[in-house]
Amino acid sequence: MNTINKKEIEKFSKIAAEWWNPNGKFKPLHKFNPIRIKYIKDNIIKKFNLNSSNKPLKTINILDIGCGGGLLSEPMSRLGASVVGIDASKKNIEVAKFHAKKNKLKINYICASPEILKIQKKFDVILGMEIVEHVEDINFFIKKSSELLKKNGLMFIATLNKTLKSYVFAIVGAEYILR
């Protein structure tokens, strides 16, 4: 079994160069990211009883599954976290590595999925943001992802609801309301 949906990987590989274009194909994520980052940061601080200093996540190890070009990995790194970002698209990983290096960030990007990740540690926090709608087997994805989480760790999973109403709200919300 695996979680990789080859059609989704091909689709995202074709648009990998767009990740850091705030007006490109990932514009809704760029608009929504500040809200996501604050929510994640605040919940990590609360869960692990951290000080909200300049680098509040400096003691936290994060695994960002389906990291794409690093839109969430980079802010988590800037907040002090030690970040490993994984994505099944080699092109996404190349974009993420290039952008992190350009911004002098130390993020370990690996072309992998949760079931094939060869890493000997477990993580305080796992991020699976806007990824489950792109995997082959959601239950297997959740199982394999949670095996990488430390006991009493924190896992964030988010996806768009697959209804017309939620799609319209997400697009309209990201495009107009979050300006």
Segments and roles (model prediction):
Residues 1-26:
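N-terminal, positively charged/glycine-rich alpha-helical extensions of SAM-dependent methyltransferases
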Residues 4, 32, 36, 137:
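Soluble or luminal CAZymes and related metallo-dependent hydrolases
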Residues 22-47:
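Conserved SAM-binding loop and adjacent beta-strand
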Residues 26-29, 103, 109, 177-178:
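A C-terminal cap/extension of S-adenosyl-L-methionine-dependent methyltransferases
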Residues 47, 51-167:
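Conserved SAM-binding loop
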Residues 164-179:
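Short, glycine-/aromatic-enriched active-site segment of Class I SAM-dependent methyltransferases
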